[in-house]
Amino acid sequence: MGLNKERRTRNRKRQVVKHPCVQDPDRELLQFNVRLAKARQAQADTNRIERKAFREHARVENAVTAYARELCARLEEQSFSRGLTLRSIPESGDAVLIVQLSDLHFNERVDLPSNRYDFSIAAQRLAKLASRVKQLGKSYGARKVVIACLGDFLNSDRRLDELLSNATNRSKATLCAVDILRAFVLDLREQFEIEVYGITGNESRVNKELGWSDELASDSYDLMIYEILKRGFAGADGIAFKGFRSNELLFEVMGRTFLCLHGHQIGANVQKSVQEITGKYAARGITVDFTLFGHLHASAIGDYHARNASLVGSNAYSEAGLNFCSKAAQNVHVVTPGTIDGMKVDLQDVSGIEPYPFAAEWEAYCPKSERKLHTPSVVYQVVV
């Protein structure tokens, strides 16, 4: 008993009592490592953000470069304006026709029970439109046709990881569109003098951001198509490309001022929105007599404005996703010294219509409307 007590006493004497002010070296090392890891993570996050910003700009620049290269290669394969024999320009007429051309979405493919659309059907529908314009021209004694191009001639796939890989497809789709529109212009030129104006749409922009400045808004496939047609028809008698603007454009026909918009800047109250926009010009002393726009893919012609439908008609997204059905149609307006008569030309049924010839090997599509039906789901997400 006494021996055990003596051992416990010796053990207590051997114990070292640490003063609270003396720091544990292991704990200090651990804290230093944690601070170092946090600093490294902060630097890694900064580098990741900087690399992402550079990567996005580099992808866009590489995609545009590849697109231009492919486009030049395709242009070298065709003779755009050789061998043209144009009829003489009509010397007089009592009317001018305005063809409201918008939302053509050439590279969209639709295969529904109620509607089909591809490049061939687009060529048929434009051929049908030209025949209706010619009929109206004969009835009203028109000498000139003004084509107002209101944008969204192509669907653009703006996902950065697909921009470069789809450069060939987009260049081919651009030239398919040019080929069909070239035939459309030449068809009308058989009977009329032609003037063409153009603006950009929202769906055919190259960048994913919707821009309102001229620099951003003009980065569009609509401008590319317009410029190719303009250069291809340079020097052609009776075909004049008069002007292109990013968002809004004015032109005059028989003393009337027309305003061109795409339509994505117009709100739910169409009449109010149109009057607000024309009010800007009234403040500058410019009276707008009629406003032309599209965007919504549904025809609506009023006293002071006309909304165009699309050349496509209903697609998978509009029918299944929005429960919204529409027909393929474009507007034509007959302008005389005292009147502006507008009408919708129904282009849905093209049975028996011969399509314009185009290079079928250039067909390339963007299945954008069907992809809108698939809602992405995030399996695992880290938010910083």
Predicted regions and their residues:
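Conserved protein kinase catalytic core
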Residues: R109, R158, N207, A268, ...
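Catalytic phosphate/metal-binding cores of nucleic-acid and nucleotide-processing enzymes, i.e., regions
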Residues: A127, L175, L188, P355-F358, ...
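Basic, amphipathic N-terminal segments that precede the first structured/catalytic domain
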Residues: G2-Y140, H333, V345, D349, ...
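A short, hydrophobic/aromatic-rich structural module that often spans a beta strand
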Residues: G198-R205, P357-Y365
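Core catalytic region of metal-dependent phosphoesterases/phosphodiesterases
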Residues: F54, G83-L104, L112-L229
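Conserved beta-sheet core of the metallophosphoesterase superfamily
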Residues: E215-S246, M254-W362
